[in-house]
A protein has these predicted regions:
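NUDIX/MutT-family hydrolases
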Residues: 25-27, 34-67
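Charged phosphate-binding loop/patch that engages nucleotide di/tri-phosphates or the phosphate backbone
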Residues: 57-71, 222-229, 233-235
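Glycine-rich adenosine-cofactor-binding loop
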Residues: 77, 161, 194-199, 203, ...
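Glycine-rich phosphate-binding active-site loops on the catalytic face of alpha/beta enzymes
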Residues: 94, 136-147, 177-191, 217-239
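Structural motif
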Residues: 85-87, 131, 173, 206, ...
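Catalytic beta/alpha-barrel core
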Residues: 72-80, 86-168, 179-181
Length: 239
């Protein structure tokens, strides 16, 4: 098939006992008409189905990047990391200061893989921390300033979006997921115009990356959100 929208996603080098395997991983957008032209032996699987398939060891890091949790907790307290459920990650939404960098340096390395931080904060970390924190957040202002090919290969990006233009921008430059908000009213942003579920669904169905619903949600809303084309939900409280 003739792919028009694609980008390099990762490069993986894995050493077996008798051979070194180099994998070049790409993301591509495939239209419905193109999908109908893809026949056996090719098969398509949802992300959540991949863990049940038998892949070689070389593919494991790629599979980990493709697997997103269904709930993203947003907090300023790093202690929240130790309270996460298996299907959660923490987006540490804080002002970028030297004190915040020092806080990260005091965390056990094994906890960092569950953490999402803004790209600007990530850029101030040491090499080991940068290699461990593989999920980076983009504010909308950062998102619109970037072009395809400028994201770091081997890292996955999740972008803050509020409309179709920014969702499409996130997809086009190679973001792996998006936070679309505000879906419902929130105490932290009273009076802000909300999308509502109907508009959220209309927007989310127009891109091929996972879209997380953000704004006024709680854990009990997950199933309903997924019925509205959300991959998962995110929020400050009750998530």
């Amino acid at each position: 098939i003739d792919l028009e929208h694609w980008h390099a996603f990762d490069f993986i080098s894995h050493e077996y006992e008798d051979v070194i395997v180099n994998l070049h991983v790409f993301h591509a957008s495939v239209s419905a008409s193109q999908l109908s032209g893809i026949k056996k032996p090719w098969s398509w699987y949802a992300r959540e189905q991949l863990s049940s398939l038998n892949f070689p060891k070389a593919n494991q890091s790629m599979l980990q990047k493709l697997q997103w949790p269904q709930r993203i907790k947003i907090a300023e307290d790093l202690a929240t990391l130790q309270q996460l459920d298996p299907d959660q990650m923490l987006y540490w939404r804080v002002a970028i200061t030297p004190e915040r960098v020092m806080q990260l340096q005091q965390l056990p390395i094994e906890l960092l893989s569950k953490l999402i931080i803004n790209q600007e904060l990530w850029s101030q970390l040491n090499e080991l921390q940068q290699q461990t924190i593989r999920t980076l957040h983009l504010k909308q202002s950062q998102l619109v300033a970037l072009q395809a090919g400028q994201l770091l290969r081997g890292y996955r990006y999740i972008a803050a979006c509020h409309d179709l233009a920014t969702l499409q921008q996130a997809e086009q430059i190679g973001c792996e997921a998006a936070l679309l908000s505000p879906v419902l009213a929130t105490p932290t942003h009273p009076g802000t115009e909300t999308l509502g579920w109907e508009q959220f669904q209309q927007l989310a169905t127009q891109v091929q990356i996972p879209v997380f619903a953000l704004g006024g949600l709680k854990t009990e809303d997950l199933s309903y959100a997924q019925g509205r084309h959300a991959y998962g939900i995110a929020g400050i409280s009750n998530i």
